[in-house]
């Protein structure tokens, strides 16, 4: 009986060690939330005339809602932006913002930026893969709600549309053991 008990304890210990050292991995399709509200597309004009917005309305993404009992180890974001240029030659910068306070989304530094050189009548596809967001942004993804904003800026006299075609966040969480 004692041998079976020791075997069971050893098997459970091995299983626990093999589970990734207390890590959980979550994959959030941020694009699906943005597409559902038609916030995946943003026109751009350069130079920007007065009164023309360069941002989408802030969008709500349901996140993990784990709270402070865990630590975010890694937040990898990847996807693709298409710059559908109708006129002019220049560069478009597509910036993505995250925050847990809706009113603060556009007040900070963007989480990441994607650039694309554009020419008239051509769609420029710009894939991106950000291996890990800045440390200051990682705790945001433990909240139950994360707000997302998108801004475009341009150089040159150009016009067109920036269309997000994919945006995923892969979040690696580690339990706190202290």
Model-derived features with residue positions:
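Short beta-strands within extracellular/lumenal beta-sheet-rich domains
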Residues: 46-69
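Sec-dependent bacterial lipoprotein signal peptides
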Residues: 1-19
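Short, surface-exposed beta-strand/strand-loop-strand elements in extracellular ectodomains
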Residues: 87-105
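Cysteine-clustered segments with highest specificity for TGF-beta superfamily mature ligands
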Residues: 117-165
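Bacterial lipoprotein signal-peptidase II cleavage site
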Residues: 20-26
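Solvent-exposed serine/threonine-rich low-complexity stretches and specific carbohydrate-binding patches
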Residues: 107-120
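A short beta-strand element within beta-rich, extracytoplasmic domains
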Residues: 70-88, 165-169
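Post-signal peptide N-terminal segment of mature Sec-exported envelope proteins
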Residues: 27-50
